[in-house]
């Protein structure tokens, strides 16, 4: 931590227990096996443009999306989970909900970038730091029989409590063909995280992940616990309205925190309205980490230094974001949802 503070003077140690709700182990070592797919190269281009728009750490840079990408992110020969722990300790993050990168639409549905099994092995190395968040999709191509079997196995035999649904590679959030998945998740008492808002990177389809579609799901499965990633941006208002009257809908700030520097007013409006409609106890923090360690730095500093502008408090009635609220968003809200003990810090 001392080395981190020296390199980044604005970064100082704090006492917030932090859990990253969205941390991808994206199979960096595997990408050389499928980077020839044109759809993968479109994804790389989209990722770079998203990083530029958010003012986050750029990962891939290429002048022509058809060309093989070059990587400017921090290089490491370490296993992804080992490098992740270095980042967690460097930036004072206690735990991370790790999820595999499916992205089968980028490989012609021939392979996933990383798998649930790989993440289970990674978590065995750091059981007090890593929480496995399996991705059971794509639901439609797999079929419900296999999806439900794996859901039961991972929940009951491997104690997984958080499951990711990535609509852009699959189908609409409210596709009734996947109702059996929601029903079984509700029965098991597990939480479902869902990518909401925009797809961000081709060839994923944005129409599949519109927050308004959640309304059908939570009306039919009122007790199902859902974490909506990315605050539903740019359809934040629709997500806030869904959360307003459905007490088991949580809003994740993953991806958007770098706007504390690049677009502070926009971020303040997103956070202020989410708290106003869902309540501070249903807002959770995350990075949307996919490789660059700087994403942790930006997400930590972004929330830690955040203050609700007085003008927005006056114009919209937004509440001040107190230290207690930040503590909940950083970790204790998600800890209560997943049954995590926060009495002792885990970041070294």
Task: Cite the ranges covered by each PLM segment.
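A generic "structured core" feature
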Residues: 19-23, 126, 217
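Active-site gating/metal-coordination segments in enzymes
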Residues: 94-208
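Catalytic pocket-lining loop regions of alpha/beta-barrel enzymes
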Residues: 4-8, 158-162, 170-285, 293, ...
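Mid-to-C-terminal alpha-helical segments outside catalytic/metal-binding sites
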Residues: 1-19, 30-88, 95, 279-282, ...
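Divalent metal-coordination and catalytic microenvironments
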Residues: 22, 88, 96, 119, ...
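Alpha-helical scaffolding within the catalytic cores
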Residues: 78-84, 114-121, 146-150, 210-214, ...
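Histidine-centered divalent metal-coordination motifs
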Residues: 22-30, 195, 230
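Short, flexible/disordered intra-domain loops and linkers
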Residues: 35, 72-73, 105-113, 201-208, ...
């Amino acid at each position: 931590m001392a080395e981190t503070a020296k390199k980044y003077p604005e970064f100082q140690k704090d006492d917030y227990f932090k859990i990253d709700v969205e941390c991808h182990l994206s199979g960096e070592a595997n990408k050389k096996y499928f980077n020839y797919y044109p759809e993968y190269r479109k994804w790389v281009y989209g990722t770079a443009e998203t990083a530029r728009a958010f003012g986050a750490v750029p990962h891939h840079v290429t002048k022509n999306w058809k060309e093989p990408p070059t990587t400017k992110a921090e290089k490491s020969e370490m296993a992804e989970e080992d490098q992740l722990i270095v980042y967690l300790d460097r930036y004072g993050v206690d735990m991370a909900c790790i999820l595999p990168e499916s992205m089968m639409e980028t490989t012609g549905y021939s392979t996933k970038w990383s798998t649930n099994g790989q993440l289970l092995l990674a978590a065995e190395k750091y059981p007090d730091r890593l929480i496995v968040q399996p991705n059971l999709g794509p639901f439609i191509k797999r079929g419900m029989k296999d999806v439900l079997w794996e859901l039961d196995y991972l929940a009951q035999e491997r104690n997984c409590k958080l499951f990711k649904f990535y609509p852009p590679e699959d189908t609409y959030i409210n596709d009734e063909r996947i109702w059996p998945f929601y029903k079984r998740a509700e029965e098991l008492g597990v939480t479902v995280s869902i990518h909401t808002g925009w797809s961000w990177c081709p060839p994923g389809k944005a129409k599949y992940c519109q927050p308004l579609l959640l309304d059908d799901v939570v009306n039919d499965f009122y007790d199902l616990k859902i974490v909506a990633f990315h605050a539903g941006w740019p359809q934040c208002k629709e997500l806030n309205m869904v959360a307003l009257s459905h007490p088991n809908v949580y809003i994740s700030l993953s991806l958007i925190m770098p706007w504390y520097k690049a677009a502070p007013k926009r971020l303040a409006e997103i956070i202020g309205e989410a708290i106003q409609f869902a309540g501070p106890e249903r807002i959770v923090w995350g990075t949307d980490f996919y490789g660059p360690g700087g994403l942790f730095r930006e997400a930590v500093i972004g929330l830690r230094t955040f203050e609700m502008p007085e003008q927005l408090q006056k114009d919209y009635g937004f509440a001040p974001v107190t230290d207690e609220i930040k503590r909940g968003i950083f970790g204790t809200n998600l800890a209560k949802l997943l049954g995590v003990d926060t009495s002792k810090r885990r970041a070294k």
